[in-house]
Amino acid sequence: MFRSILIANRGEIAVRIIRACRNMGIKSIAVYSKEDKDSLHVQLADRRVCIGEGPAKNSYLNMERIISAAKNTDADAIHPGFGFLSENADFVRLCKENGIAFIGPSAEVIDSMGNRSEEHTSE
């Protein structure tokens, strides 16, 4: 079991993951943009890390900042929630390269989902 999980998301999904972590005795680490500093998920988490300015591309979609936050807080795993990086195979590979577990499908599964989506759109 993990000791700590970094939640790479915001809002209600992050709150639900934080509460699940608490119920399981796992420490939660919230990431947040400067715009979200007063959000509920930030308040509820055991630890919190600012990952940049407001636009998602500069914060919640910035893979390097999220990996850095996970490493700096000794997170055992990253939970992406949904959206943002949850279906990004490159992010899954980056987690693996940095010794951080990714809670979600493998990069290969995500790659195959993308290929199936491309097949359907080309029909």
Predicted regions and their residues:
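N-terminal beta-alpha lobe that positions the nucleotide/phosphoryl donor
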Residues: 1-123
